[in-house]
């Protein structure tokens, strides 16, 4: 993979997480021309410059304008008359690299605090409540150089939201009581990351460079850095927050992006009105001209012990900041070649030796002044013994690039691919789009901000050679991550406790790498045959339907077809479910289905990589019902890739060496589940408890030893012997072509695997356990790795139907913001606090998910206390407030998909759940608008109140690593201080000791009836 892994080694810090479940022919450049009228804004002294020539894609119907305000804020305005949601983002070009040395995490803490009250809007949840009532949401993140705040809201309420948002940058309160509470949220956020290998490796990389360089700082912060130590040293953190904000939150370091239905003139006036008062303190842009890795930090080897059983090799070179060369992007060119996965590539050779499975190569962001070039691979057991040889191969490939010299045709191909990607770019969700653009405005001229990261302009062999010259053995840093180093390390990283050992790489090894010769196995990539050439948008057929239509229904297959009538891009989504009773019949078969598809994807990788580069990707997974295949992207060459995958499926020959390697990697991934987050464990156990048939990780591990090569070889024809295929073909494709695609898939399977249809009785889905009225069950487990508890509380309500769906969703809409405000902001139970619907197997209910240092039975009591307060809140709610919630939910539900793949995913969800309610949003919103407050109170009293006659509750308590035991229920009188609402006394729950016995004693719900009459659905 080229140019990647920025997340793995450079995670940003997202905050205020309301939801946890929470990178041809060039295009014709279209310019947004000057409007005919002279704006009233032209002579506005608050505006220094207006830029109306914003280069955009020819397919982009939105209007853009750039502004530079007199106070130095850069602005991009986007007028989109069709948008359901408006959005805005502000990016401050300051991050954790600018933290005071004695208060690590201050910039991140400042980001948290800005959400909690301003002079104009002092109520601490004013902003989040306003957004929640108007179908909005918000978030923010802090990285080394940026603090990025963003929100979305229903399009009518942009001004109200933007006014509240602007106050963050004008006059935040930094209220002392909020500060004392919110430090716990930051601490909980850090605690969540402490045992996460990505965060640990990122901090270790920072810690092993120049300790005086800002890069070495600890960016998240925790209670020790933001409260305990400052208190000991007599530092007032509130004063430091005020000082940090008044020093660095300067308009000359800010960039804003606003998207709304309003005209560009109206958006201009809005931004000028709200942001021209932000003070310009003329803060110099932080720059870091010295690289954190100097000579003494090079030619070093780091042996690192991970938390999970992973084996990775990270090879890093310090390189200069290439940002200014974005029009030629030499790092992209080298990443494209070094990270290539086709025949003759570095990865191809390392895989054939049995040393690695995956490779990522390319430039990685540092900060203004420095960057890195990385080549990262995962290691097989054999690969761990050949690290020196793997790195020698890397230098042989780099030597090949030097010997061949920069190739203009390779640059041209990258340029063409990027140009096609820009021309046919999917529309993005407003919130993500504004956040991304606000960050880019600091780096690129206003008129080129949309194109800068796509359109390559000049081939600069001199720059390619310059970067290539940095990729030498004398500049290398090597990190090996493996459990095999346990007990053999002598250093501990300060903030995460990572165990590691540092050694100088011996000079004879450096010499060996310097003498790397040319390896005849290495070849430059050949011309990419998957680059699309036909971009014709097919005319809508006369019988085109607004929703997927069933155009084929036989014993072998059901084919749903929908010609795109919204996005008009040369793309399609082809989704297939291959239903087989053999895929999940027991843990052994589940393992074999998984390994078959992993081996299949592994063998297809060289072929399919070129397609992926050309914007055509596929996904292949085993499911509890069989196999899922999707092919997405440009429709031009789609059938070629699909045919290759289907033929390979039906004629697959397993390579013995790859079988052993992939089986071993699978065993490690099963073992590594123990190190997942406590809240993820809670969700996993609940799924096992509630689903009729579900195999545990332990059962899969136990059965994996029985998977032998002969057994797997015998399983594949059995799996393919009888199938039922259900498909959705959606996009720039005709009905005739769709029927042809389906026929090709069937013919290939029949010809090569002699596939026959399944019996209708074999097509039944799994069902959900039905809890008894007034029943409350608790299941307890311990997480061996994390020192936090996790809980999922599930109130099962009923089968899915239009009415039940709306009762539940409206209740969830009403409690969502108060839940976050009460349990996270005020009570500080933890960083992860979530409430919302849970749906599985056609059954649904309300769920709460919390991760906390507090014990699970305490979290349970606080959720119950919160629910009681919500009963009163709903009873006291005005009709106007109630209607706001109905409106907010309606807007959320009717928010149109922004791209073909999102619309397709929605329809596919209806197909795999076998509900087929393609017009669900309109049908359910129409019902929603008939609901009254009394309906919701009745729903609560019948289903959710402590004494509700039809209350059905399951709680999963995941204990922290250091807790031996914990009561399942308890009273907490000492905790009930004046600020806490009283928790109700709870009955003694039934403790689940054995999952199988629990399920055996309870009935199952029936399956939901499909919404569609299949005879009528056929065209």
Swiss-Prot record:
EC number from the UniProt entry: 3.4.24.56
SUPFAM superfamilies, sorted: LuxS/MPP-like metallohydrolase
Cofactor(s) listed: Zn(2+)
Annotated consequence of substituting residue 429 to S: Greatly decreased activation by polyphosphate anions
Enzymatic reactions: Degradation of insulin, glucagon and other polypeptides. No action on proteins
Cofactor note text: Binds 1 zinc ion per subunit.
BP-aspect Gene Ontology terms: amyloid-beta clearance; amyloid-beta clearance by cellular catabolic process; amyloid-beta metabolic process; antigen processing and presentation of endogenous peptide antigen via MHC class I; bradykinin catabolic process; hormone catabolic process; insulin catabolic process; insulin metabolic process
Phenotype when changing residue 111 to V: Abolishes catalytic activity. No effect on substrate binding
Protein name, entry field: Insulin-degrading enzyme
Organism: Rattus norvegicus (Rat)
């Amino acid at each position: 993979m080229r140019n990647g892994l920025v997340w793995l080694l450079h995670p940003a810090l997202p905050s205020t997480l309301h939801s946890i479940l929470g990178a041809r022919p060039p295009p014709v450049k279209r310019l947004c021309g000057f409007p005919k009228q002279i704006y009233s804004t032209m002579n506005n002294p608050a505006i220094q410059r207006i830029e109306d020539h914003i280069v955009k894609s020819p397919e982009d119907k939105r209007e853009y304008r750039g502004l530079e305000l007199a106070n130095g804020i850069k602005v991009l305005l986007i007028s989109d008359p069709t948008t359901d949601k408006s959005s805005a983002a502000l990016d401050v070009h300051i991050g954790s690299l600018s933290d005071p040395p004695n208060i690590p995490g201050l910039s991140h803490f400042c980001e948290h605090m800005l959400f909690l009250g301003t002079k104009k809007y002092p109520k601490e949840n004013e902003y989040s409540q306003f957004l929640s009532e108007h179908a909005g949401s918000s978030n923010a993140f802090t990285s080394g150089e940026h603090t990025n705040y963003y929100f979305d809201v229903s399009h009518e309420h942009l001004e109200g939201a933007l006014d509240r948002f602007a106050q963050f940058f004008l006059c935040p309160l930094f209220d002392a009581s909020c500060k004392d509470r919110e430090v716990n949220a930051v601490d909980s956020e850090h605690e969540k990351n402490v045992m996460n290998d990505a965060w640990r490796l990122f901090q270790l990389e920072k810690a092993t460079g120049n300790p005086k360089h800002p890069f070495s700082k600890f960016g998240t912060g925790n209670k020790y850095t933001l409260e305990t130590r400052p208190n000991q040293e007599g530092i007032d953190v509130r004063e430091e927050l005020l000082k940090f904000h008044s020093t660095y939150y300067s308009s000359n370091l800010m960039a804003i992006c606003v998207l709304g239905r309003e005209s560009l003139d109206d958006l201009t006036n809005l931004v000028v009105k709200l942001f021209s008062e932000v003070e310009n303190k003329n803060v110099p842009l932080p720059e870091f001209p010295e690289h954190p890795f100097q000579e003494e930090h090079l030619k070093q080897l780091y042996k690192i012990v991970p938390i999970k059983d992973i084996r990775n090799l990270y090879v890093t070179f310090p390189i200069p900041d290439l940002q200014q060369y974005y029009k030629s992007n030499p790092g992209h060119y080298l990443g494209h070649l070094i990270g290539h996965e086709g025949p003759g590539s570095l990865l191809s050779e390392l895989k054939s030796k049995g040393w690695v499975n995956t490779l990522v190569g390319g430039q990685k962001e540092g900060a203004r002044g420095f960057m890195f070039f990385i080549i990262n691979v995962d290691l097989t057991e054999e690969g761990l013994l050949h690290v020196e040889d793997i790195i020698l191969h890397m230098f042989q490939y780099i030597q090949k690039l030097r010997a061949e010299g920069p190739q203009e045709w390779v640059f041209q191909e990258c340029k063409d691919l990027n140009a096609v990607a820009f021309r046919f770019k999917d529309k993005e969700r407003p919130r993500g789009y504004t956040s991304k653009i606000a960050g880019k405005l600091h780096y690129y001229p206003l008129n080129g901000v949309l194109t800068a990261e796509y359109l390559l302009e000049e081939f600069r062999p001199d720059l390619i050679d310059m970067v290539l010259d940095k990729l030498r053995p004398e500049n290398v840093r090597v990190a090996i991550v493996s459990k095999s180093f346990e007990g053999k390390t002598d250093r501990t990283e300060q903030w995460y406790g990572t165990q590691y050992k540092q050694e100088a790489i011996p000079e004879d090894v450096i010499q060996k790498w310097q003498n790397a010769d040319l390896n005849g196995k290495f070849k430059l990539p050949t011309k990419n045959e998957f680059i699309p050439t036909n971009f014709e948008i097919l005319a809508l057929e006369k019988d085109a339907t607004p929703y997927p239509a069933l155009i084929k229904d036989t014993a072998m297959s059901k084919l749903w077809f929908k010609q795109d009538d919204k996005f008009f891009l040369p793309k399609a989504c082809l989704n297939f479910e291959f239903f087989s009773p053999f895929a999940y019949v027991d843990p052994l078969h589940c393992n074999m289905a998984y390994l078959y598809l992993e081996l299949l994807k592994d063998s297809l990788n060289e072929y399919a990589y070129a397609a992926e580069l050309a914007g055509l990707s596929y996904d292949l997974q085993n499911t509890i019902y069989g196999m899922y295949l999707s092919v997405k992207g440009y429709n031009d060459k789609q059938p070629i890739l699909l045919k290759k995958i289907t033929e390979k499926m039906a004629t697959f020959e397993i390579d013995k060496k790859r079988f052993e390697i992939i089986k071993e990697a699978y065993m490690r991934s099963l073992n590594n589940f123990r190190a997942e987050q406590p809240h993820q464990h809670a969700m996993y156990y609940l799924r096992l408890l509630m689903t009729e048939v579900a195999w545990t990780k332990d059962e899969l591990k136990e059965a994996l030893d029985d998977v032998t090569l002969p057994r797997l070889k015998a399983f594949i024809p059995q799996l393919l012997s009888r199938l039922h295929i259900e498909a959705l073909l959606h996009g720039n494709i005709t009905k005739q072509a769709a029927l042809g695609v389906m026929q090709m898939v069937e013919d290939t399977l029949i010809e090569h695997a002699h596939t026959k249809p399944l019996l209708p009785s074999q097509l039944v889905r799994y069902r959900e356990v039905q809890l008894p009225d007034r029943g409350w069950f608790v299941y307890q487990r311990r997480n061996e790795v994390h020192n936090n508890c996790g809980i999922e509380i599930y109130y099962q309500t009923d089968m899915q139907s239009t009415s039940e769906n709306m009762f539940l969703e409206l209740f969830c809409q009403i409690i969502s913001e108060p839940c976050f405000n009460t349990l996270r902001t005020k009570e500080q139970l933890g960083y992860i606090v979530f409430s919302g619907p849970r749906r599985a197997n056609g059954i649904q209910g309300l769920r709460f998910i919390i991760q906390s240092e507090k014990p699970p039975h305490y979290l349970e009591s606080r959720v119950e206390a919160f629910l009681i307060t919500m009963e009163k809140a709903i009873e006291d709610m005005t009709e106007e407030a109630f209607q706001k919630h109905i409106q907010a939910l309606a807007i959320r539900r009717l928010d149109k998909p922004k791209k073909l793949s999102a619309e397709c995913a929605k329809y596919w969800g209806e197909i795999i759940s076998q509900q087929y309610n393609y017009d669900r949003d309109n049908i359910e919103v129409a019902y929603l608008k008939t609901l009254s407050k009394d309906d919701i109170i009745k729903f609560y009293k019948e289903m959710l109140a402590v004494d509700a006659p039809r209350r059905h509750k399951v709680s999963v308590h995941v204990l922290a690593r250091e807790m031996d035991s914990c009561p399942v229920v308890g009273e907490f009188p000492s905790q009930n201080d004046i600020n806490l609402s009283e928790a109700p006394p709870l009955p003694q729950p039934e403790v689940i000791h054995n999952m199988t016995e629990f399920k055996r004693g309870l009935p199952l719900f029936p399956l939901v009836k499909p919404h569609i009459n299949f005879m009528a659905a056929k065209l």
